[in-house]
Amino acid sequence: DVNMLWYVXR
């Protein structure tokens, strides 16, 4: 999921 990318990389 793309949402997980920004969520983890915040």
Swiss-Prot record:
Keywords: Aminopeptidase, Calcium, Hydrolase, Magnesium, Protease. Its cofactor is Mg(2+); Ca(2+). It is an enzyme of class 3 (hydrolase). Its EC number is 3.4.11.-. Coiled coil: none annotated. Optimum pH is 7.5. GO terms for molecular function: aminopeptidase activity. The lineage of its organism: Bacteria, Pseudomonadati, Bacteroidota, Flavobacteriia, Flavobacteriales. GO terms for biological process: proteolysis. Aminopeptidase which hydrolyzes substrates with free N-terminal amino acid residues but not N-terminal blocked ones. May be important in the nutrition and pathogenesis of the organism in the human oral cavity. It comes from the Bacteria. This is Aminopeptidase. It comes from Capnocytophaga gingivalis.
